[in-house]
Amino acid sequence: FHLKNTEISRSSSQLMPENNQINTERKYAPNTVGRQEFVDSISRMAAEVWDFHNRFEIGSGQFEGQSATDIVANRTSILDEEFNELAQAISEKEGDEAVADETADILFVAMGHAEAMGNPGIDGIDRVSTKSAAKTSKTHAIRPDTGKILPREGKPHKWQ
């Protein structure tokens, strides 16, 4: 599933902000859902992923001796299907509820990948959470044409 930018009017040098520059094109608006409501919802989903895997005997225990890469490689078709369903919901204008459900399906399957890997999946979640928590507006900026948070220094190719 790829969303394409049909037109980018800025050059890469205009996209990459200076270290002391603040992106004034975007205005902050507070999150529309409370932190605890969001965290509780994700936690309920994680618990259901674990229960689902246990119920259908498809969890991490069945993959003993396989590498995390092999486990996920064998599951990618599930995630591909969910991305395709999201793309279809968007392109066929099925509405916000369908798009929200397909987005949640992607999250459910991605969380399933992490559980299926066992400890390497949990370690990956912890590394990414720690890395994301360390990002600040001084170290990272929002690329205006994509909305992606990127490092201000060290990866100029990502600003092109």
Positions of the model-derived regions?
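Flexible "arm" and connector segments at domain edges
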Residues: 15-160
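Short hydrophobic targeting helices and cationic amphipathic motifs
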Residues: 2-3
